[in-house]
């Protein structure tokens, strides 16, 4: 286990990992090994990916997406809660403990960690999908101060009960609340690809142009938007990468380029 006395006053790292690889035991074990070794201790935010859709279908509902975000009716919310707060959270916590870390699974509902309002989207109604409005950073700092890695499931508390939250947006909100040095969004690609090449840096204006021309599309859009939101809220850097590049590779989202870049 991590020594609870080990404390570092530097800002920590917030890592968001997507759900589509979290049913791969080898990936989960390697992720846990890398995350457990990071100092200062990081915060991990996870998705649920295809496991949510599979369970949703088992419950008799067909998954659908609006603008890259999961439409969440009552059945979809039940599936998301069961997968995110249940099987995926337990799997990640078990892997981190096996890797020598101390970890605790927590959702955005627990202790009112993440508060949300219903998210509006120009592409249509999203159902019970929330937009983060507040994060109780002190809850996470207390865990970190005691040597515990928080593993956050993005089910959050709205004015009328639980809401599903896009994990990228949840990670951006958590990163902003903690004032972290960097938010890292782990995907199944090595970064934002333009004509097959990983872009080392991208600015807001470049991202908007690449979204407009279709180069950035689908599930990558919420990731780059969350990265920009994290920057707007004061996070020093936001990076999109894969597991192999978690520590220092991928695409770093910046406010603007220096003149020599």
Curated annotation (Swiss-Prot):
Function: Catalyzes the ATP-dependent phosphorylation of N-acetyl-L-glutamate.
Protein localization: Cytoplasm
Pathway: Amino-acid biosynthesis; L-arginine biosynthesis; N(2)-acetyl-L-ornithine from L-glutamate: step 2/4
Keywords: Amino-acid biosynthesis, Arginine biosynthesis, ATP-binding, Cytoplasm, Kinase, Nucleotide-binding, Transferase
One Pfam match: AA_kinase
Keyword Transcription: no
Record-listed substrate binding positions: 48-49, 70, 164
Name of the protein in its database record: Acetylglutamate kinase
Class in the EC hierarchy, top level: transferase
Signal sequence segment: none
Site residues by UniProt (Transition state stabilizer): 16, 223
InterPro entries recorded: AceGlu_kinase-like_sf (IPR036393), AcgluKinase_fam (IPR004662), ArgB (IPR037528), Asp/Glu/Uridylate_kinase (IPR001048)
Family designation: Belongs to the acetylglutamate kinase family. ArgB subfamily.
Gene Ontology annotations of biological process type: arginine biosynthetic process via ornithine; L-arginine biosynthetic process
Presence of the UniProt keyword 4Fe-4S in the record: no
């Amino acid at each position: 286990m991590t020594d609870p006395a080990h404390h570092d006053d530097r800002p920590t790292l917030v890592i968001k990992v997507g759900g589509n690889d979290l049913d791969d035991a080898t990936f989960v074990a390697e992720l846990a090994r890398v995350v457990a070794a990071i100092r200062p201790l990081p915060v991990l935010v996870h998705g649920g990916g295809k496991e949510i859709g599979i369970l949703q279908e088992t419950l008799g509902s067909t998954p659908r997406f609006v603008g890259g975000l999961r439409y969440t009716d009552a059945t979809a919310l039940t599936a998301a809660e069961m997968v995110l707060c249940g099987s995926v959270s337990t799997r990640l916590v078990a892997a981190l403990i096996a890797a020598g870390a101390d970890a605790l699974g927590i959702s955005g509902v627990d202790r009112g960690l993440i508060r949300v309002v219903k998210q509006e989207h120009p592409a249509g109604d999203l159902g019970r999908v929330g937009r983060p409005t507040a994060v109780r950073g002190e809850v996470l700092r207390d865990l970190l101060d005691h040597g515990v890695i928080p593993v956050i499931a993005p089910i959050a508390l709205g004015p009328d009960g639980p809401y599903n939250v896009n994990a990228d947006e949840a990670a951006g909100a958590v990163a902003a609340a903690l004032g972290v040095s960097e938010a890292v969004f782990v995907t199944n690609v090595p970064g934002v690809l333009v004509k097959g090449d990983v872009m080392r840096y991208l600015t807001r204006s470049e991202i908007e142009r690449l979204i407009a021309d279709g180069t950035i599309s689908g599930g990558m859009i919420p990731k780059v938007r969350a990265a920009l939101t994290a920057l707007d809220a004061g996070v020093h850097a936001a990076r999109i990468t894969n597991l192999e590049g978690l520590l220092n590779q991928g695409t770093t989202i910046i406010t603007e380029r220096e003149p020599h870049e």
